[in-house]
């Protein structure tokens, strides 16, 4: 390869290293619904569609006898949120358990601006799924599930 062509190729390659990752420009902040989250970034909808929850765990979640609320604190800019929030949505959809509900809260990327979005909760990493039974926290999934979203929920709920 001639020297001028090598220089051009080198410039093109090095310039591409500084292109920011493509993601939606606007952060999702505060209370936000499932549909808005999935519409915000199509890759999240794809991740939800592709996720295959464990059928045995889903059966256990369907057997809930008490109301369970999951408070989901996530960052629309966060790769761990992009992996695990869509998985939770698929679990909720496939479990189809009326007593299992989620409320989602978007959090800013800038750490110094996050406190008001945590509603007084102690949250250090995202996503954080707070699992509440009768309004009392019984467990949480922080950043990455130990096994899977559905298996961790079953464990936390003692099902």
Which role does the model predict for each range below?
Residues 1-8:
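Bacterial N-terminal signal peptides that target proteins for export
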Residues 8-17:
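Bacterial N-terminal signal peptides
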Residues 23-65:
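N-terminal leader/targeting and pre-domain segments
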Residues 57, 84-87, 149, 153:
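Stable alpha-helical elements in mature extracytoplasmic
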Residues 63-94:
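Local sequence-structure signature of Cys/Sec-based thiol-disulfide redox active-site neighborhoods
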Residues 72-76, 99-113:
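Thiol-based oxidoreductase modules, predominantly thioredoxin-like and allied folds used
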Residues 113-126:
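Structural alpha/beta surface segment adjacent to cysteine/selenocysteine redox centers
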Residues 125, 131-159:
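Non-catalytic, surface beta->alpha helical segment in thiol-disulfide oxidoreductase systems
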């Amino acid at each position: 390869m001639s020297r001028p062509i090598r220089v051009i190729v080198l410039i093109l390659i090095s310039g591409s290293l500084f292109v920011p990752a493509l993601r939606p420009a606007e952060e999702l902040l505060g209370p936000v619904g499932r549909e808005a989250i999935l519409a915000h970034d199509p890759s999240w909808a794809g991740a939800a569609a592709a996720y295959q929850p464990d059928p045995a765990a889903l059966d256990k979640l369907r057997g809930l006898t008490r109301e369970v609320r999951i408070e989901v604190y996530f960052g629309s800019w966060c790769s761990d949120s992009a992996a695990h929030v869509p998985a939770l949505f698929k679990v909720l959809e496939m479990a189809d358990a009326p007593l299992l509900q989620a409320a989602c809260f978007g959090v800013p990327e800038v750490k110094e601006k996050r406190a008001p979005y945590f509603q007084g909760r102690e949250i250090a990493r995202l996503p954080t799924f707070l699992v509440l039974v009768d309004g009392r926290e019984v467990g949480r999934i922080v950043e990455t599930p130990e096994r899977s979203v559905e298996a961790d929920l079953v464990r936390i709920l003692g099902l």
